A protein has these predicted regions:
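Cyclophilin-like peptidyl-prolyl cis-trans isomerases
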Residues: 1-195
Length: 195
């Protein structure tokens, strides 16, 4: 019921806030710097809309879990993916695995969907192998293609359609992947990694 209300608000309220559309960091957001050998990527995270994904990401980051990991899946004009300690896309687990079965049954934690977050260019989202299988892997949307003319106005808010002019992957929207952050500086680094 709340999701339906939020969707209606996102679609009809011209004052609806889409946090990805601003580089300003709100009080209820977190900022993280991802350091790579190509440069730094600064992201803001959205715990209000994706509390599990943000807590998992921040805890792993603070614990050094992500240190030295490769971007093991790199597809130019699509996305770059990391977070797997095995480096091949088959590894990684959530901070709750084996500790809290109410959050991670053993297969990963649940998807979090918000009609205020989308797979826009620069969006961070959890990579998974199906519903509710989120572990430690995440991707950054890198696609530069303008999708705005291809998006149905009954499914995407006008401000988001406008934002998709800059690229992203709207085919990943709809709740299958938890969007939990947005690059606010260093998108050029994301492009360097993708190339």
């Amino acid at each position: 019921e709340q999701l339906r209300k939020d969707f209606n608000d996102a679609m009809t309220n011209e004052n609806a806030v889409f946090p990805q559309l601003s580089n300003e960091v709100a009080e209820d957001e977190a900022v993280v710097k991802i350091t790579t050998n190509k440069g730094d990527i600064t992201v803001k995270l959205f715990p209000k809309y994706a509390p599990l994904a943000v807590e998992n990401f921040l805890t792993h980051a603070k614990d050094g879990y992500y240190n030295g990991l490769l971007f093991h899946r790199v597809i130019n004009n699509f996305m770059i993916q990391t977070g797997d300690p095995k480096g091949d896309g088959t590894g990684g687990e959530s901070i709750w695995k084996g500790k809290d079965t109410s959050k991670d049954s053993g297969a990963g934690f649940e998807n979090e969907y918000s009609p205020y977050l989308y797979n826009l260019r620069g969006a961070l989202a959890m990579a998974n192998s199906g519903p509710n299988t989120n572990g430690s892997q995440f991707y950054i949307n890198q696609n530069k293609e303008d999708w705005s003319s291809k998006l149905p106005t009954e499914r995407f808010p006008a401000k988001i359609i406008e934002a998709y002019k800059n690229g992203g992957n709207p085919t990943l929207d709809g709740g299958n992947y938890t969007v939990f952050g947005q690059v606010i500086d260093g998108l050029v680094v994301v492009d360097k990694i993708a190339e």
